[in-house]
């Protein structure tokens, strides 16, 4: 990945999407 921070945000967004 490019940046860990960006990856974290992406993961968080994906998790939120999956949860919803």
Swiss-Prot record:
Keywords for the protein's UniProt record, in alphabetical order: Secreted, Toxin
GO molecular function: toxin activity
GO cellular component terms given for this protein: extracellular region
Tissue: Expressed by the venom gland.
Coiled-coil features, chain-numbered ranges: none
Subcellular location: Secreted
UniProt record similarity statement: Belongs to the cationic peptide 04 (cupiennin) family. 06 subfamily.
Protein name stated in the entry: Cupiennin-6f
